[in-house]
Amino acid sequence: MNKYKNIKRRKSNRIYVGNVPIGDGAPISVQSMTNTQTTNIEETIKQIIKLKKVGVDIVRISVPTLEAAESFKIIKLNVDVPLIADIHFDYRLAIKSIKYGADCLRINPGNIGNKRRILDIVNCAKDKNIPIRIGVNAGSLENDLLKKYKSPIPEALVESAIRHIEYLDSLNFNQFKVSVKTSDVFSAIEANEILAKKTVQPIHIGITESGALRNGIVKSSIGITSLLLSGIGDTLRISLAADPVEEVKVGYDILKTLGIRFRGVNFIACPTCSRQEFNVIDVVNQLEKNLEDLSTPMNVSIIGCIVNGIGEAKVSTLGIVGGSKTSALYKDGIRQKNKLKNQEIIKELEIKIRKKAKSLDKLKKII
């Protein structure tokens, strides 16, 4: 797999969310957020388990009430993924969440309250040695900044962030990351570019409230890719009005495409035409679903005919080239003697992919 060699990541400090390193050259972590009712403990745990299956590094959970904080405590005891408590308005819920085992807090400068409340949160975070995210959002900017700038322009978002960065610095607290988010792609890019020049703390990136699945993927891909290519971003979330599992998949797909971080199978598949000898779309979609749990990076080409099939197969870990009734199989660029029956491609190729993953994992351990 080729790596985009011209990406030079911005230098930043290192913090840890649970056992996940963030900043200072650490792998860019992929986050998501539960969309269940936090008080529905069983469903929230189930969703976190699903997120872990597709490789989530960190999960954020909304804690809007004391009952939700009590639920957070139980959830934390039943999952092994680092959890961020998402806090708005009531600083006491932040303190409760820290005491109940949160690995990190997200606080919103626009609604968390005065410096005294933030001081209490920071003192508690220091005591438990956990980080905080200063999460600035265009939809909840401080009133004085809205009055000054008339609207949540990039400069307003950054001023909010810097205001709180300076306060945390004055408290000798450096275990924090920062985010400046807006639903407008270009405003988000500009705000992060300005912020990156003004702080050495890790930056969390994302396009907030980006929309439903298709539109949200497009917006997030454009915004996040632009920032990553500039070396900005130490952790990310794809915000979608969709199943949170999709957020994680898209996050990894972006990192994979840029050659920054690899997880699981990278499928190369043709868009299909009348030349296809088997149903490429069905095969790819089913294999993607079946292999969600696989973390071993590899390229698998699934091409419906010989036009581009052979060329793609020769540069793939495994490759299928469509033929009449049976299709050619390539392994590490070499055509194999045995062919796969077109009606059994999904089953047989999944077996071969999993077998190859085991051999690659074993080789990696030996090396």
UniProtKB/Swiss-Prot annotation:
SUPFAM superfamilies per the UniProt record, alphabetical: Dihydropteroate synthetase-like, Nitrite and sulphite reductase 4Fe-4S domain-like
Cofactor(s), by name: [4Fe-4S] cluster
Alphabetized Pfam families for the sequence: GcpE
Sites where the protein binds [4Fe-4S] cluster: 270, 273, 305, 312
Family: Belongs to the IspG family.
Source organism of this protein record: Buchnera aphidicola subsp. Schizaphis graminum (strain Sg)
Identification of the protein by name: 4-hydroxy-3-methylbut-2-en-1-yl diphosphate synthase (flavodoxin)
Recorded name of the encoding gene: ispG
Enzyme class at the top of the EC tree: oxidoreductase
Keyword Manganese: no
Co-factor remark: Binds 1 [4Fe-4S] cluster.
Gene Ontology biological process terms from the UniProt entry: isopentenyl diphosphate biosynthetic process, methylerythritol 4-phosphate pathway; terpenoid biosynthetic process
Iron-sulfur as UniProt keyword: yes
Record key words, sorted: 4Fe-4S, Iron, Iron-sulfur, Isoprene biosynthesis, Metal-binding, Oxidoreductase
Superkingdom field: Bacteria
Gene Ontology MF: a single term: 4-hydroxy-3-methylbut-2-enyl-diphosphate synthase activity (flavodoxin)
Enzyme Commission number: 1.17.7.3
HAMAP family: IspG
Function: Converts 2C-methyl-D-erythritol 2,4-cyclodiphosphate (ME-2,4cPP) into 1-hydroxy-2-methyl-2-(E)-butenyl 4-diphosphate.
UniProt pathway annotation: Isoprenoid biosynthesis; isopentenyl diphosphate biosynthesis via DXP pathway; isopentenyl diphosphate from 1-deoxy-D-xylulose 5-phosphate: step 5/6
Known catalytic reactions: (2E)-4-hydroxy-3-methylbut-2-enyl diphosphate + oxidized [flavodoxin] + H2O + 2 H(+) = 2-C-methyl-D-erythritol 2,4-cyclic diphosphate + reduced [flavodoxin]
